[in-house]
Amino acid sequence: MEKKKPRTLVEKIWERHVVRRAEGEPDLLYVDLHMVHEVTSPQAFEALRLAGRRVRRPDLTVATMDHNVPTTDVRLGVRDRVSARQMEALRKNCEEFGIQLHEWGSPGQGIVHVIGPEMGLTQPGMVIVCGDSHTSTHGAFGALAFGIGTSEVEHVLATQTIPQRRPKTMAITVEGEAPPDVTAKDIMLGILHRIGTGGGVGHAIEYRGEAIRNLSMEGRMTICNMTIEGGGRAGMVAPDEKTYSYIEGRPHAPKGRAWEEALEYWQSLPTDEGATFDKEVVIDAAELVPYVSWGTTPAQTVPLDGEVPEPQNEGHERALRYMGLRPGTPIREIEVDTVFIGSCTNARIEDLRAAARVLEGHKVKEGIRAMVVPGSMRVKKQAEEEGLDEIFKKAGFEWRNAGCSMCLGMNPDILSPGERCASTSNRNFEGRQGKGGRTHLVSPVVAAATAVMGRFASPSELGVPVEVG
């Protein structure tokens, strides 16, 4: 009998989901979960309507409102007309096509990449798609998850399949234990600093190594979330006991015999010994530190203890001009105007707990605008049950409702021109948080300490132990 070739995690999932293969054409993959939001879906539903088609598997399609929603009181309504139209369109489309919608302000509403995992919808071995580039977040569970365009959203709605060319494979191994003050966000910023914004183009990336295995599921979600910032098509972590424990008992998790069968499948997914990748990168976790982005890409980062670097090319010079920074300036001397804790990268309960531990007993520096936006209404409720909201409010933070918020300039939470923000989000492009806004990417604990000091700071400056969890 011929010995089977060792396979990677992505290869195993891919082969299981191919429903049609033809020479010279993309493979046609079956989709296990399609997540929908108000921004990239209206045209797709309208195209279905014009063609007289139905949604093939509404039971495998879940919708929420997140990108455009105001994060203040729902009773105040939506003032922006475009946002209001998109939200109303999603309501009507979900009702017409029989899709479950987590309405703005409802108990299940939140950022699409937060609610999927917390409801147990996201599971190992699945193919998951959404009209959003940070769909790679779900890969933390050992799923093949990637963002798609509006025309592809229509295709999935109509057929529950998607044509895709198989990506190359890439392994990023973070060896050893990370220092106690290094968070998942710092690990990912360190990876991006190493590989750049194009290092993963055309690849499905599997994150491996002791430092990755040591992360909680929420930490792994932070890692996989920012895969697209390195150019990767998908980011994945092989499932293990942490994965199974996180899923078990959640609303959409398998039950009884179905759980045992699912577990058997999930345990077969990790990359086989001897399997090879098209590209490999190895990083020593001991060399990682807390990072702050200085420029206008997530790869333009330096250590918190470092300085704004000398420009190496015209792109760096443009970034420095836009950010209003001078080379040689110590990062810890850069003052901020705003602090934002939120987004699909860092707005889960562990992120909020970590930030609250830093803030307890401290006050936001006068003149600093600071806000916390939970990733979902479930996260908000849990945080309030734990008293985290009181810690944030006593410190001087605004405590908001769930939504994408200041991660992107598509809702009322935006920066003014020249306003400098320490943000736990995933992108720092020009104008990402509002025209002329200056975004620095940081971890939740650095964001919290920065709010207190009014400049970039670490928790240790406030007397908080360096072990950040």
Swiss-Prot record:
Any single GO BP term: L-leucine biosynthetic process
Catalytic reaction(s) noted: (2R,3S)-3-isopropylmalate = (2S)-2-isopropylmalate
Recorded GO MF terms: 3-isopropylmalate dehydratase activity; 4 iron, 4 sulfur cluster binding; metal ion binding
SUPFAM superfamilies in alphabetical order: Aconitase iron-sulfur domain (SSF53732)
InterPro entries on file: 3-IsopropMal_deHydase_lsu, Acnase/IPM_dHydase_lsu_aba_1/3, Acoase/IPM_deHydtase_lsu_aba, Aconitase_4Fe-4S_BS, Aconitase_4Fe-4S_dom, IPM_dehydratase_rel_enz, IPMI_cat
Binding site for [4Fe-4S] cluster: C344, C404, C407
Cofactor(s) essential for the protein: [4Fe-4S] cluster
Keywords: 4Fe-4S, Amino-acid biosynthesis, Branched-chain amino acid biosynthesis, Iron, Iron-sulfur, Leucine biosynthesis, Lyase, Metal-binding
PROSITE patterns referenced in this protein's UniProt entry, alphabetically: ACONITASE_1, ACONITASE_2
Top-level class of the enzyme under EC nomenclature: lyase
Cofactor binding, note field: Binds 1 [4Fe-4S] cluster per subunit.
Residues spanning the membrane: none
Annotated metabolic or biological route of this protein: Amino-acid biosynthesis; L-leucine biosynthesis; L-leucine from 3-methyl-2-oxobutanoate: step 2/4
EC numbers for this chain: 4.2.1.33
Family: Belongs to the aconitase/IPM isomerase family. LeuC type 1 subfamily.
Record text on subunit structure and interactions: Heterodimer of LeuC and LeuD.
Matches recorded under PANTHER family: 3-ISOPROPYLMALATE DEHYDRATASE, HOMOACONITASE, MITOCHONDRIAL-RELATED
Role of this protein: Catalyzes the isomerization between 2-isopropylmalate and 3-isopropylmalate, via the formation of 2-isopropylmaleate.
Name of the featured protein: 3-isopropylmalate dehydratase large subunit 1
Organism: Rubrobacter xylanophilus (strain DSM 9941 / JCM 11954 / NBRC 16129 / PRD-1)
